């Protein structure tokens, strides 16, 4: 909505300036005013569409886009094995974002290697950032988190504090509140 005020000022100011041109000002000013009204209609449509989504507004959309900056786009990992450095794509502990019983959320560019019992084995990458133990995506735990996020977004929208809640969610991405459930190592040399 704030961006719309800037665009309105520019387009309407341009239309006024066009009206002051001698001889051709009247037709050019009218055309520029029509263009400014068309831009205003588009702005109103975008404001209506983004303002009526539960828990979303255009500024929340921009904050969500900026949240992509908190996760690296690609990575390579190096481990020190008896004085030698090996390039591996096994996730180090610093790349693990969230752990569930059967799924691990990690940064892109690596695959978790989990030590269970006396053996370390690679988990199956379902997406660039999600790996599971057996290649099946568990839905029970995901549904619980999705329900919590959707409920929070709806409540924030109903209380008209969507921007504040969006900011809190983004700051929350910087902190992990869940304990470690798996022992991840870098001894598997998993393939992506």
UniProtKB/Swiss-Prot annotation:
Region named Important for lipid droplets localization: 48-51
Cytoplasmic topological domain: 1-52
Gene Ontology biological process: clathrin-dependent endocytosis of virus by host cell; fusion of virus membrane with host endosome membrane; symbiont-mediated suppression of host innate immune response; virion attachment to host cell
Ranges per topology, Lumenal: 74-192
Example of a GO cellular component annotation carried by this entry: viral envelope
Renumbered residue ranges of the record's region Important for fusion: 149-180
Residues with glycosylation annotation: 80, 93, 118, 189
Propeptide: 62-75
Molecular function terms from GO: RNA binding; structural molecule activity
Stretches of the chain forming a coiled coil according to its record: none
TM region positions: 53-73
Site (Cleavage): 61-62, 75-76
Keyword Ubl conjugation: yes
Top-level lineage group: Viruses
Pfam families noted in UniProt: HCV_core (PF01542), HCV_env (PF01539)
Keyword Glycoprotein among record annotations: yes
Gene3D superfamilies on file: Hepatitis C virus envelope glycoprotein E1, chain C
Keywords from the named record: Apoptosis, Capsid protein, Clathrin-mediated endocytosis of virus by host, Fusion of virus membrane with host endosomal membrane, Fusion of virus membrane with host membrane, Glycoprotein, Host cytoplasm, Host endoplasmic reticulum, Host lipid droplet, Host membrane, Host mitochondrion, Host nucleus, Host-virus interaction, Inhibition of host innate immune response by virus, Interferon antiviral system evasion, Membrane, Oncogene, Ribonucleoprotein, RNA-binding, Transmembrane, Transmembrane helix, Ubl conjugation, Viral attachment to host cell, Viral envelope protein, Viral immunoevasion, Viral nucleoprotein, Viral penetration into host cytoplasm, Virion, Virus endocytosis by host, Virus entry into host cell
Annotated spans, Interaction with APOA2: 6-57
Note from the entry: Viral particle assembly takes place at the surface of ER-derived membranes in close proximity to lipid droplets. NS2 associates with E1/E2 glycoproteins, NS3 and NS5A, which interacts with the viral RNA and core protein to promote genome encapsidation. The nucleocapsid buds at the ER membrane where E1/E2 glycoproteins are anchored and afterward associate with nascent lipid droplet to acquire APOE and APOC. Secretion of viral particles is probably regulated by viroporin p7.
Family: Belongs to the hepacivirus polyprotein family.
Protein name stated in the entry: Genome polyprotein
Native organism: Hepatitis C virus (isolate EC1) (HCV)
């Amino acid at each position: 909505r704030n961006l719309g005020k800037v665009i309105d000022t520019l387009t309407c100011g341009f239309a006024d300036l066009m009206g002051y041109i001698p001889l051709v000002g009247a037709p050019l000013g009218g055309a520029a005013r029509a263009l400014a009204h068309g831009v205003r209609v588009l702005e109103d449509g975008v404001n209506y569409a983004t303002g009526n989504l539960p828990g979303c507004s255009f500024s929340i959309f921009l904050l969500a886009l900026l949240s992509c900056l908190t996760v690296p786009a690609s990575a390579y990992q190096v481990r020190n094995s008896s004085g030698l450095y090996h390039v591996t794509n096994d996730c180090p502990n610093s790349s693990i974002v969230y752990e569930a019983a059967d799924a691990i959320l990690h940064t892109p560019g690596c695959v978790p290697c989990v030590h269970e019992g006396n053996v370390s084995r690679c988990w199956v990458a379902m997406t660039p950032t999600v790996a599971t133990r057996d290649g099946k995506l568990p839905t029970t735990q995901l549904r619980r988190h999705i329900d919590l996020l959707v409920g929070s977004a709806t409540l924030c929208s109903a209380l008209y504090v969507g921007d504040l809640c969006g900011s809190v969610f983004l700051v929350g991405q910087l902190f992990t509140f869940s304990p470690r459930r798996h022992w991840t190592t870098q001894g598997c040399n998993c393939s992506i």
